[in-house]
Amino acid sequence: MELDIDLPDFGPFEGGAPVSEFSSPDNPVFGLDLSGSLHSSVMSVSPTELLLTENLMSAPGSTALTHLTTPSGYDTSPAFTEDWNASPLFAQNDFETAQEWPSLFPDAETSAAPAPALAAPAPVPAAQAEDSPSVDSEDFEPARRPSQARKSSASSSPSGRHSSVSGVSARRRGKPLPPITIDDPSDTVGMKRAKNTLAARKSRARKAERMDELERQVRELEAEKEKLAAELAHWKSLASSQGAAGQ
């Protein structure tokens, strides 16, 4: 089925129809009169340059029209234009004096504060050290013996050797310890503390017995050493006397 539509306002699309009849009625810029010879030299115009006219003060985004011409002044950065104010705080061409700008951080805050001096530990009172359960003269006595042995060995002569040179000295025996008493048998904390105290006493007693046994062995070895030294001196003197007589 064919429909016949009468369009009196539009001319027929024929080869001889003038192009000026199809000009834009809204904007005379787009009304191009190309009725002349088609073989004449006409400059090509891209859609981007058509939109960048004085009548249209803004250009569309880069996604609207592709860039069909060489870069122009409209495509450059606005920072290089004379009428563009990049920041209200700085005037035009004020970037050359950047070294004269005030610092964001004052010099007083940037200077490092001196490190505080380390406080020396406060001395422990003698009464508090004696009352402390972790301080025991018997536990620290073996640690002091090597230094005492070095001092005595450096100051004593070879002829006056005795058991103290080897780091053995008489142990100081304190007063007998009081018996462990528990007032309330239902007190679990007190019972546990009493058991720990009894175990510590037994351990110290075993250590004391072991130290006594070692001291006894050291005394016996010192006596045997002195006896052997005397015999060696006797035999040396006898050998030297016989050698002198044989010569």
UniProtKB/Swiss-Prot annotation:
Keywords, sorted A to Z: Activator, Amino-acid biosynthesis, DNA-binding, Nucleus, Transcription, Transcription regulation
InterPro entries the record matches: AP-1_TF_bZIP, bZIP, bZIP_sf
Short name of any one Pfam family annotated for the protein: bZIP_2
Leucine-zipper: annotated segments: 214-228
Domain bZIP: 186-247
Ranges where the record places region Disordered: 107-213
Subcellular location: Nucleus
Ranges of biased composition (kind: Low complexity): 107-129, 145-169
GO biological process: amino acid biosynthetic process; nitrogen catabolite activation of transcription from RNA polymerase II promoter; positive regulation of cellular response to amino acid starvation
Gene Ontology annotations for the cellular component aspect, listed alphabetically: nucleus; transcription regulator complex
Spans annotated as Basic motif: 192-210
SUPFAM superfamilies attached to this UniProt entry: Leucine zipper domain (SSF57959)
Statement: the UniProt record of this protein carries the keyword Amino-acid biosynthesis: yes
UniProt KW tRNA-binding keyword: no
GO terms for MF: DNA-binding transcription factor activity, RNA polymerase II-specific; RNA polymerase II cis-regulatory region sequence-specific DNA binding
Subunit comment: Binds DNA as a dimer.
Role description: General amino acid control transactivator. Binds to the AP-1 consensus DNA binding element 5'-[AG]TGACTCAT-3'.
Name of the protein described by the UniProt record: Cross-pathway control protein 1
Species name: Cryphonectria parasitica (Chestnut blight fungus)
